[in-house]
């Protein structure tokens, strides 16, 4: 098993071997490779390069190693996320150009959707800031932190306008969304409000609005530590089932946490009273990922220059730190199972 690590540095992308516990490859030809995505069918790793003139680098797995096989511009600035559709199209969320791009290869001119508007926050929401684009079944979803909304597209016709636009409360600053694998439910984590909104994906009615912060904590700024708490990533663990999210900049920068709660297996809603805070060994968990069986968890601790790898006990959120991986400003982690690479 491999663990791929993206960073907000000049590169490279790091490939860590989970068996030998060592960095086995450093993938060059990237700049600020903050997001990575694996496409299993083609055995290709797609890397979003979060620089002003953003681009995507593509690495192919062959004969036990990665090789750079493609690199194309996206006609957008600072892509923070990407997804690969079944037809080979690559979608990127371009944070600093208020746009979503669709590209296919270096010889194809990107198709770009531009967004306009603003919302409540005087610094973070003066314009559109798409933060994520992701695919689920026949849907493509883009999440816009600056406009306080997310949009749903038909994956078969991403050249058209969105089929659904969902507005969230002003000032919430939505960041990432994750869809339940078997239930018609999705979970939207909001960076600025430190809250998760639960939606019915048939109607996109909001079912719940849940805080990820400890009960005693507020969003008021501390003059000694001006960085306010900000939520980052969200995921579903299906053997609980649990909903898990990461909190950044708690406790005056001393120690951050994962928030977790049990989900109702029938409705997919958060079960009130099951919320827990799991303290981590560091600060700024910008991204995390469970492996396919959810027995392992990797957490990118951006401000500590470390990735933490935990063992998770079955059907619980009890975590045991196994080891740490030095990595400069890690921003994204991606497990690649042996069967993915075979």
Curated annotation (Swiss-Prot):
GO annotations of cellular component type: cytosol; nucleus
GO molecular function, one term: 6-phosphogluconolactonase activity
Residue runs in coiled coils: none
Composition bias, Basic and acidic residues: 104-126
Residue span of region Disordered: 102-129
Gene3D superfamilies documented for this protein: YVTN repeat-like/Quinoprotein amine dehydrogenase (2.130.10.10)
Domain of life: Eukaryota
InterPro entries: Cycloisomerase_2, Haem_d1_sf, Lactonase_7-beta_prop, WD40/YVTN_repeat-like_dom_sf
Transmembrane segments: none
UniProt family annotation: Belongs to the cycloisomerase 2 family.
Name recorded for this polypeptide: Uncharacterized protein C18E5.01
Lineage: Eukaryota, Fungi, Dikarya, Ascomycota, Taphrinomycotina
